């Protein structure tokens, strides 16, 4: 994710993730999966982390800074209802599949209970996609019967459709 964000240099990084990923380093590695959002903030001006439900004490302290907004799973629907306004700021959307509740997407490396429903993930993708210059889905593995991969594929499709529809509207092609 971090190199892709660096390539498109968005102003806002939006991620669906169970974890804050704001560590300075993890096991001596500044590029660990536990440090992604911290690295991204070297490029993006702001990070919005949707669905986060775990992090170290230092990560929660870093999340208190002005450039980070954390939206708990129970508050994601309210965030969507408030119709987030990106204005003319560019965004990058990253979906870490562990944002989903592990009951619907167990195929990930670090499951956390009480996650988001597929509908919530889809709604975030549809809302943010029109503002995006980049998108990814990460941390999907084969530890289940394909549930996580199927959800990831559907979210990719939703992104492509929503992004293309917004581009068509902007070009005047209805």
State where each predicted segment sits.
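Conserved alpha-helical scaffold segments that buttress catalytic/binding sites
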Residues: 1-174
């Amino acid at each position: 994710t971090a190199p892709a964000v660096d390539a498109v240099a968005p102003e806002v990084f939006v991620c669906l993730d169970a974890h804050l990923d704001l560590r300075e380093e993890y096991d001596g590695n500044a590029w660990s999966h536990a440090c992604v959002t911290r690295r991204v903030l070297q490029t993006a001006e702001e990070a919005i982390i949707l669905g986060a439900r775990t992090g170290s004490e230092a990560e929660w302290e870093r999340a208190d800074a002005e450039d980070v907004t954390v939206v708990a799973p129970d508050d994601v629907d309210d965030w969507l209802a408030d119709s987030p306004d990106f204005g003319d700021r560019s965004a990058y959307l990253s979906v870490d599949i562990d944002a989903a509740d592990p009951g619907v997407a167990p195929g990930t490396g670090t499951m956390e209970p009480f996650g988001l429903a597929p509908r919530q993930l889809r709604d975030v993708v549809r809302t943010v996609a029109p503002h995006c210059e980049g998108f990814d889905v990460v941390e999907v593995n084969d530890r289940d019967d394909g549930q996580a991969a199927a959800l990831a594929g559907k979210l990719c499709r939703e992104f492509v459709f929503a992004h293309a529809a917004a581009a068509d509207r902007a070009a005047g092609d209805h």
